[in-house]
């Protein structure tokens, strides 16, 4: 199968995708209701889209093509409200969070769609274990080579996105010690991790053709990279974030990525090399394990600082681009998180410490999703 032609798109436009948990309102475990939700919303009018995901206990919402923080926030609120209304009719709850705190993966039911059934047959139990919930952000790119430049430039900031969005400290009734345990589920897939260091679309086409010829992949969907190009959309897709507990947080993180993209493509502050990835896995682990308190190492200078400090320094550098995009309010929220060194994982642990119940913690996640 040939690689799709890269469709040039309007630079720095963006779209947001959120995978959402569907829970019962008895004990707040995951429940099977995606098909029923899809049936209820099929005639509803809302921006963007709502689609099923790999199991019946999750559903995905996505915005249209956005240009500003206000637009993204408005669309996310409208789609969220549509889904919440349908969920109320079914007496089920919806919430964010990268993992469900106490669900048992073996109880999950794969959604009845050809690709999901194929994934289940190929990956076995990993498919059901993949009932985890992420935020993806697409960024429009003017051409294919710019997309690859942006992909590898953006990789330096992967720890920021993980730490800011982290909302998955609990797995199967256990505090994992991680801020984002969700990404540990992604690591199990053979084509996860980072994209190959290729800076021209011609070179990327050659790489893709070789992979297809091995029989390992059929399409770009088979790559579970942290950031991957989406040629049919003319975007790169940042895929490392946990689904935040609120759409407001999701919009702020998306606009941080949008503003970074403008800075990286217009100012071109980084000289890219394969050596940029020497500390990639270390920095990624630190963000997953310790959140904003984690350490990140600059691959070019060797300087070590906390991820929170690195975010605050980055916000100063990209401030002119935030002004140009109208994303100052979003970046103020990001700065407040970095200064306080708290994220949604911190909030979940605080609630559990107060309530001594993961069931109650998930119930409060559902309340927060409505805010």
From Swiss-Prot:
GO biological process: modified amino acid biosynthetic process
GO molecular function, one term: glutamate-cysteine ligase activity
Top enzyme category: ligase
Keywords, in A-Z order: ATP-binding, Ligase, Nucleotide-binding
Ligase keyword on record: yes
Family as reported in the entry's similarity comment: Belongs to the glutamate--cysteine ligase type 2 family. YbdK subfamily.
Protein name: Putative glutamate--cysteine ligase 2
Taxonomic lineage: Bacteria, Pseudomonadati, Pseudomonadota, Betaproteobacteria, Burkholderiales
